[in-house]
Amino acid sequence: MQQLNPSEISDIIKQRIEKLDVASEARNEGTVVSVSDGIVKIHGLADAMFGEMIEFPGSIFGMVLNLERDSVGAVVLGDYLQLEEGMTAQCTGRILEVPVGPELIGRVVDPLGVPIDGKGELDTKLTDAVEKVAPGVITRQSVDEPIQTGLKSIDAMVPIGRGQRELIIGDRQIGKSAIAIDTIINQKGKGVTCVYVAIGQKQSTIANVVRKLEEHGAMEHTIVVAAGAADPAPMQFLAAYSGCTMGEYFRDRGEDALIVYDDLSKQAVAYRQVSLLLRRPPGREAYPGDVFYLHSRLLERAARVNADHVEKLTNGEVKGKTGSLTALPIIETQGGDVSAFVPTNVISITDGQIFLETNLFNSGVRPAINAGLSVSRVGGSAQTKIIKKLGGSVRLALAQYRELAAFSQFASDLDEATRKQLEHGQRVTELMKQNQYSPLSVAEMAVSLYAANEGFLDDVEVSKVLDFERALHAYMKSEHAELLDKINQSGGYDDEIQQGLKSGLETFKSTQTW
């Protein structure tokens, strides 16, 4: 061992003293006063900001939601059972952010962006704030491009445009999620990235949805954000905002995205739970006063933005492209009561609603869409030309049928015109039925609607209408593939297409008996 003389030792000590960094680091630190039900009260965080992340020992984080005179109320994002009174809590100076980017596609993540599908870590390069301000009026563009759901009753009667917010509302177990999942499946190959946000659902239900999306090749363009029924209430109410941020990444880069919130009723219940635990005053149905703002600030973020907005956000990398985020929020009603607090709120925020009815579902009309109460306020201008032309008379036929069906229950003898309208309405109602996971192309839909409008179904038995439709689609695909391709590509409706549809249907009817 080398011997050091006393002068060298003193030199080394001097060097170490000179290198010593004694700059003080100011950190705002408080003490946990109480922990209960995922809510933490902290004393001493005078500089805490609303929505700021708070760090506890053991890398547990919370979010500030209450700013009181002598304490701060925060929700714990994770396992609050590890926290105790007297522990320290530190301000981070950051707001909640989640990972964003194309790396998330095909993955299942929790509301904080942590993967929960067992497929390894995420290699995302960017993060973005969960709470963001919606695009202003000047940066928006009118909705004029369709989102094809592949469902006849929606695309023909309640069309949805890119950048629209269309509410799906109805009682439990009548096919609300099925409509949303079919829409996601139908976006395959259409350049639309989908985000499915599951809020407060059973883990088995979420797993089943993911499995179905994988079976139909839809996970290749879908991100699933899952906050199960067993997850803490703060995670359930944050899930929607996290999913929205992930969808906005694509919107702000000139791409199209679709987000499904399944469902916002459970999000409102989770937010009510958090608010009551934070001792905020309850209002109607015990919801807090800002439950309208909870949903409005979320749904206003779904929009179609103009090319200038996209160019500005991408620093000039993307030019001349508009972006869109289309929202399909789902609301569950109790006993068909759409006048409850949360349903009326969301109806007033969205650009229309698809109303599902229990009676229709039980009588075999699936999807169980009530054409009279369902409406799309902006989708008409985004509808494909051929579907707009052929779909108008379908809605009219169904409206007249409902009116006459109610009247005919009391009338014993009906005149010929009324009887014909009733029979036509029965066939159109039957034609609007569609199996789950079997979305139709624009051309297939056009063929079905044309057959209904031009009276080709009038001599077909009501019970055989769907068999007739299946056989017709198979015939048109084999004999008139060019015509179907032309309709799918252009979406137009001219004399040539009309003549092609007419001759195809006439030939089909002449070769087969129904």
Swiss-Prot record:
The annotated site for Required for activity falls at 374
Q: Cross-referenced PROSITE patterns, in alphabetical order?
A: ATPASE_ALPHA_BETA
Alphabetized GO MF terms: ADP binding; ATP binding; proton-transporting ATP synthase activity, rotational mechanism
Its localization reads: Cell inner membrane
Question: What InterPro entries does the entry give?
Answer: ATP_synth_asu-like_sf, ATP_synth_asu_C, ATP_synth_asu_C_sf, ATP_synth_F1_a_nt-bd_dom, ATP_synth_F1_asu, ATPase_a/bsu_AS, ATPase_F1/V1/A1_a/bsu_N, ATPase_F1/V1/A1_a/bsu_N_sf
Under the subunit heading, UniProt states: F-type ATPases have 2 components, CF(1) - the catalytic core - and CF(0) - the membrane proton channel. CF(1) has five subunits: alpha(3), beta(3), gamma(1), delta(1), epsilon(1). CF(0) has three main subunits: a(1), b(2) and c(9-12). The alpha and beta chains form an alternating ring which encloses part of the gamma chain. CF(1) is attached to CF(0) by a central stalk formed by the gamma and epsilon chains, while a peripheral stalk is formed by the delta and b chains.
Annotated family: Belongs to the ATPase alpha/beta chains family.
Protein name per UniProt: ATP synthase subunit alpha
Its source organism is Chromohalobacter salexigens (strain ATCC BAA-138 / DSM 3043 / CIP 106854 / NCIMB 13768 / 1H11)
Its taxonomic placement starts with: Bacteria, Pseudomonadati, Pseudomonadota, Gammaproteobacteria, Oceanospirillales
